């Protein structure tokens, strides 16, 4: 029977790899066209984080140069 530590390690590794594979705009990562539903929550989180100025808290979000929908100003 696998130990709790090894199961936890495998789950964390799987989550890190799956996030890296479906992060849009990241250089060198695979863009899997069949996984649009997996990308949607991440892009929604990034849009909200960039809009509220909290994009720096999420390393997978790229907020530079995106227009702020509310004020039409450039987000930093």
UniProtKB/Swiss-Prot annotation:
GO terms for molecular function: acetylcholine receptor inhibitor activity; potassium channel regulator activity; toxin activity. The modification Arginine amide is found at residue 64. Expressed by the venom duct. GO terms for cellular component: extracellular region; host cell postsynaptic membrane. Residues 1-24 form the signal peptide. The keyword RNA-binding does not apply. It comes from the Eukaryota. Keywords: Acetylcholine receptor inhibiting toxin, Amidation, Disulfide bond, Ion channel impairing toxin, Neurotoxin, Postsynaptic neurotoxin, Potassium channel impairing toxin, Secreted, Signal, Toxin, Voltage-gated potassium channel impairing toxin. It is found in: Secreted. Residues 25-39, 65-76 form a propeptide. Disulfide bonds join 46-61, 50-63. Highly inhibits both nicotinic acetylcholine receptors (neuronal (alpha-3/beta-4) and muscular (alpha-1/beta-1/epsilon/delta) subtypes) and the voltage-gated potassium channel Kv1.6/KCNA6 subtype. The cysteine framework is XIV (C-C-C-C). Belongs to the conotoxin J superfamily. This is Alpha/kappa-conotoxin-like fe14.1. The lineage of its organism: Eukaryota, Metazoa, Spiralia, Lophotrochozoa, Mollusca.
């Amino acid at each position: 029977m696998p130990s709790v530590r090894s199961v936890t390690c495998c789950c964390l590794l799987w989550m890190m790899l799956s996030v890296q594979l479906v992060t849009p705009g990241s250089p060198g990562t695979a863009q899997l066209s069949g996984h649009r539903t997996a990308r949607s929550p991440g892009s929604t989180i990034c849009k909200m984080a960039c809009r509220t100025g909290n994009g720096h808290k999420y390393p997978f979000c790229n907020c530079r140069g995106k227009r702020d929908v509310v004020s039409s100003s450039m987000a930093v």
